[in-house]
Amino acid sequence: MAVTDSLSRAATVLATVLLLSFGSVAASHIEDQAEQFFRSGHTNNWAVLVCTSRFWFNYRHVANTLSVYRSVKRLGIPDSHIVLMLADDMACNPRNPKPATVFSHKNMELNVYGDDVEVDYRSYEVTVENFLRVLTGRIPPSTPRSKRLLSDDRSNILIYMTGHGGNGFLKFQDSEEITNIELADAFEQMWQKRRYNELLFIIDTCQGASMYERFYSPNIMALASSQVGEDSLSHQPDPAIGVHLMDRYTFYVLEFLEEINPASQTNMNDLFQVCPKSLCVSTPGHRTDLFQRDPKNVLITDFFGSVRKVEITTETIKLQQDSEIMESSYKEDQMDEKLMEPLKYAEQLPVAQIIHQKPKLKDWHPPGGFILGLWALIIMVFFKTYGIKHMKFIF
């Protein structure tokens, strides 16, 4: 008996220790998540996605932008928080072998245009002026809400740009340019006007690193597809379409983002490594000296995903409803079920039967008095004009 009692006590003590340790681990995990949430310091995410190139041979730049658009939507950023600027409509281009589609993978495996793409600025609207107005908020009052960047000092903003560029500039539709100085000043205006909390700038263009050299505003992290003096190369030529489908840097970034889910703990340091020189041929670059947080503590979803607000409470919430509320909800459910019944259409003949169906014979009715009188008048006029002697020449 003594041995049994001692064993039971030991088992009880061991179970208590295990429960306490498990509870402490779970509590520490919850505390870490809460600390991460409050440390991020933002309450909403925005994305400004810009393709600055037009013409069919720049198909890949439109596909780049639409691929990023698809990823941020998949991770939870709604269209109301995305400003999409496309300088050309490749989906409706006469050279497109499959209209209303834009593919980002060879053999036409992935259509990134889809059925729910909301383009906010297109064609001639994609200009340097409109881009800077979107960033700084200097927009005419008549501008619709979908074309505005309605961010605040608690907003994390992703700005993605792709096109043709050089040392210190990015071309817009081969007609104008935005310089790295103009871009840096626009970001400073955004900071002074409290239009962002943190900003992630990504650019895929030749000599892309030159575009973030002049940045001087706080809380900006920047990534580029190539260093100064290097070209950003294309990827995946498609013989059916006749052009390259994407650029190398964006292609590998999108492959990386496809593995991310809204609850992922992947950080920005992982994003820095997605496209080494062996894959991109060019040398991707990044700048973090203006950013206050350590990149390893910055989640990918802090910019590419939606903000999921979590509130920890100790209050007890009653889930049981009163009888009257239960009865009314039951009646509403019954009404909803009746309304949700599928509609039944009248039975119709198949198209083939309709085409080959014989026409219905009409019933014969004797002619009316008006018809008989008309024929009598015609005969009288004939005999008066020609007479009986001309009948032999007629018949």
Curated annotation (Swiss-Prot):
Q: How is it modified after translation?
A: The disulfide bond between PIGK/GPI8 and PIGT is important for normal enzyme activity.
Gene3D superfamilies recorded for this chain? Answer: 3.40.50.1460
InterPro entries attached to this UniProt entry: GPI_transamidase, Peptidase_C13
Effect listed in the UniProt record for changing residue 246 to K:
In NEDHCAS; uncertain significance
Residues of the active site are 164 (proton donor), 206 (nucleophile)
Q: Which residues bind a protein?
A: 206, 232, 234
Q: What is the effect of changing residue 61 to A?
A: Decreased function in GPI-anchor attachment to protein
Q: What is the effect of changing residue 92 to S?
A: Decreased function in GPI-anchor attachment to protein
- Keywords assigned: Disease variant, Disulfide bond, Endoplasmic reticulum, Epilepsy, GPI-anchor biosynthesis, Intellectual disability, Membrane, Signal, Transferase, Transmembrane, Transmembrane helix
Q: Residue span of the signal peptide, if any? A: 1-27
Result, substituting residue 92 to A: Decreased function in GPI-anchor attachment to protein. Decreases GPI-anchor transamidase activity by approximately 40%
- Which Pfam families does the UniProt entry name for this protein? Peptidase_C13
Effect on the protein upon substituting residue 247 to K: Almost abolishes the GPI-anchor transamidase activity
Result of mutating residue 247 to A?
No effect on function in GPI-anchor attachment to protein
Instruction: Extract the ranges annotated as region (Autoinhibitory loop).
Output: 231-236
Q: Does the keyword Transferase apply?
A: yes
Listed binding positions for Ca(2+) are 79, 82, 118, 120
Q: State what changing residue 125 to A does.
A: No effect on function in GPI-anchor attachment to protein
Q: What is the effect of changing residue 60 to L?
A: Reduces by 40% the GPI-anchor transamidase activity
Q: What does this protein do?
A: Catalytic subunit of the glycosylphosphatidylinositol-anchor (GPI-anchor) transamidase (GPI-T) complex that catalyzes the formation of the linkage between a proprotein and a GPI-anchor and participates in GPI anchored protein biosynthesis. Recognizes diverse proproteins at a C-terminal signal peptide (CSP) region that lacks consensus sequence and replaces it with a GPI-anchor via a transamidation reaction. Transamidation catalysis reaction follows a two-phase mechanism.
Q: Which disease is it linked to?
A: Neurodevelopmental disorder with hypotonia and cerebellar atrophy, with or without seizures: An autosomal recessive neurodevelopmental disorder characterized by global developmental delay, intellectual disability, hypotonia, cerebellar ataxia, cerebellar atrophy, delayed motor skills, poor or absent speech, and epilepsy in most patients. Some patients manifest facial dysmorphism. Disease onset is in infancy.
Name this protein carries in UniProt: GPI-anchor transamidase
> What is this organism's lineage?
Eukaryota, Metazoa, Chordata, Craniata, Vertebrata
What would be the name of the gene that encodes this protein?
PIGK
